[in-house]
Amino acid sequence: MDTIRSYIAKARAFFAAHRAARIAGYILAAWLVFVLVFHPKGTKTFLLLGMDNYGSLNTVGRSDVMMLVQVDFTRADISTVTFARDMFIPDENGRKQKINTIVRQSGEEALVTAMENAFQVDIDGWFRVNFTTVIELVDAIGGVRIDLTEKEARYINRNTGDYEPLVEGKNHLNGDQALVFARCRQLDNDMGRGERQNKVMAAMVAQTKRMTIANVVSVFSSLKHAWVSSLSGFEQVRLLGNALWLRGAHVNSIGMPLGNWKYANSGVEIKMEENVQLLHEALGLPAPVFPDKK
């Protein structure tokens, strides 16, 4: 006990005699409090809806992107799941509907309810963005680096403005180019487009490691009109603060359907139980529970 008291007394004497050491100690203590109190923990899941229109977010177009975003703040890990927009799931009345039809006819909350019931996931909120959002945010963070095939590079060059031509391999895309890349399905199908959307999201997260102070200021300026959300203003501010801990986080990209499916009735019909099981495994969720068919 005397030894401990002696060490404490010596430490007090040292800090009393050295002003710089006292300041450094205060800063270290404040940083530790910040880490322990404000470092986000746990997992949140959000539904991201991308509309096929420019300008005001009050104008609701057709849903061009259906993406579930699971954020693990404890491990700094993000999983994105893109859903084929013409996939059939039961709506809130039990009728099979395409997911983009549900949101267009009944709104975001109805789609959240339908997806929670169909896939047995808890969704903490939704965000609606549009083409303008993607362009402005990608430009604000300084563009994104994406590996392109020769066909993808040619497609983007044909469908964007007078920019330096892109080539096969690693390219730096601006907002216009990233949007065209994310929307492209002419080269393959809706599943391919979903994979490209996941690549853009992963590239945006990776780019946060390289952002300058000017980029950060530009991002916060863009966020004033970036989306419409079910979250309150306070919840959005807190989420943005939490997102600072995710700079350069690992992104795991998934495309639904994961299991058996077929194209029928002008849409994607899936084997629900198999796909739900695979989705839960991919996201590290508890095993789903299905009704007894006996």
Language model segments and positions:
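Non-catalytic, solvent-exposed segments at the cell envelope interface
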Residues: 2-294
